[in-house]
Amino acid sequence: MQNDGTFDPEASYDAVLVGAGIMSATLAALLHELDPQLRLLLVERLEAPALESSAAVNNAGTGHAANCELNYTPMQPNGRVATDKAVAINAAFERSLEFWGSLLERGRLTSTDFLHRAAHISAVWSPANIAFLRQRFEQLKDIPAFAEMRWTEDRQDLAEWMPLVMEGRDPNQAVAATRIERGTDVDFGALTRAYLLPLQSSGALTVQYGTEVSNLKRLRRPNMTEGDWRVITKGPSGRREVRAPFVFLGAGGGALPLLQRSGIPEGDDFAGFPVSGLWLVCNDADLAEQQRAKVYGKAAVGAPPMSVPHLDTRWMDGRRSLLFGPFAGFSSKFLKQGSLLDLPASVRPTNLLPMLQVGATNIELVRYLINQLRQTPDQRFDALRDFLPTARQDDWSLSVAGQRVQIIKRSKEGGRLQLGTEVVAASDGSLAALLGASPGASTAVTIMLEVLQRCFPERLASADWQARLKALLPSFYSDPKSDPDVLKGMRERSDGLLGLSR
C-alpha cells in the first residue's frame, strides 16, 4: 500500500509464485515462453534459491525415470508387477529433457552443467528379490521406453557395472542386476538457478529473497479486479501487499499451510505427514570417482518411497559425489529449515480424523520409522556395508537430507496416505498448490503443464499458446507412452541437444 492508503499498481503482477525451488522456477520458465509479457513475482523465505528440497544434498533422488527405482513397479497378487506408474514417470522425464533441450536451443539455458550421464542400475541379492527383479525385467524389456534394459547375474558383468558394490562380496552370494545405460543425474539446484537468471535479467521476473508469505486472501470488492489475490509478505523492508489474479504455492512442505490459509475448499481434504532423511556421504573423492552409476536396491516392507536404499553417484557443487541412503526419520517440521510446530499447526477439524485413520492403518510404516529413529551409527554403517562390503567408516559422514511431506487425503473411505505428488487447484483456476513428494523434481515439467491445463485452460486452448507449446515441446500433442516412434524422436532430439548421445 502507498502512504495515502491507495494500492500501488507497481505491486500488481500477473502471477505470484511462492517458493524458489525447481517447481516455481519451472512454472516461471514455462509461463515466460508462452507469454513473454507476463509480470511474474517469485517470493522465497530463504536468502537464495533452491536451498530446500531442490538442493542436491536434500533431494531424495535425482534423475528419476523409473529405470531403476523398484518402488514404482510393485508386485501384484497375480505375480506380475504393475508397470503403469513406471511408464508414466519415464514419459514425464522425457518431457523434462525435451523442455531443457528447447531452452538450450533458444539460449535460455546456457549450458548443461546441471545434467550428467549416469547409468541406472537395480541390484538385489536375496532369492525373493531376485525373483521380483527378474519378473520386473521380463515385463519392462517389452515396453519401448525400457527396451534397452539389460539383465545379468554374471559376476564379471556385475563387477564392471558396479565395482564398489561387488568388491569384497561373498562369491557364493547370489546377486542380480538390471542396467539402463541412458540414465542421468540432475542437479536441480543448479537447474533452478539457471532457470531464474535469464528471467530476472530480462525483467520478466522479480525475485524477493528473505521474504515470507504471511497471509493470502481473495479480493472480490467492486473496485478490484474480480478474483485477484491479496498476498501479504514480510521481508527485509517490512510488511508488503502484492496482488495477482493467479498464485502458485510451490514451497515444498510449506505449501500445505499456505493452502490452508488461502481458504479454498479444495484444500480441506488434505493433511501432511512429514518424513525426514539422512545420508551417509563419502568423503573420499577417489572412491566417488569409481562409482559411475546410480544403484538402487529394494525398500524394506513398510518403508516410504524416499527410503529406497541406494548408492547414488550425484553431482554437487560441480563435482561428483557419492551418497548412500536415505535413512528415514521423523520430524514435525514441514521444511528442513522449518518449525517443529509445522505439523501441529496444520491440524484442522477437517483433517484430524483422516490423520488418525492413516496412523491406525499404516502400522508397518509407523514401525519402520520407529526402527529407523532407533538406529545407531553402527547400524547405519552395517546397512552401507550390505551395499559396499569394503566400506570404511572413516570415509563416510552423516548428512541431513531434506524434508518430505507425504499427502494425507480425506476420502469417502477415510484418510489415505497418498504417495507421489498432487496438484490442488481452486475451482476457478486462480490458485494452485503442489503437495507431496517423489518423483517430484524429475517430472516438474509435466506437473507444471498440469497446472497450466487446470488454471489457464482458455489461454492454453488459444491458437497462440498452442503454437508456442508445439514449438517448445514438439511432442506435446502426441503420446510417447503409446507411440514408439514419438518416443524415439523425442529421445534423438533431446540427446542431440543436451549432449547425452556422447
Curated annotation (Swiss-Prot):
It catalyses: (S)-malate + a quinone = a quinol + oxaloacetate. Pathway: Carbohydrate metabolism; tricarboxylic acid cycle; oxaloacetate from (S)-malate (quinone route): step 1/1. Its EC number is 1.1.5.4. GO terms for molecular function: 2-hydroxyglutarate dehydrogenase activity; L-malate dehydrogenase (quinone) activity. The keyword Protease does not apply. One of its GO terms (biological process) is tricarboxylic acid cycle. Its cofactor is FAD. InterPro entries: FAD/NAD-bd_sf (IPR036188), MQO (IPR006231). Keywords: FAD, Flavoprotein, Oxidoreductase, Tricarboxylic acid cycle. It comes from the Bacteria. Belongs to the MQO family. This is Probable malate:quinone oxidoreductase. It comes from Synechococcus sp. (strain CC9902).
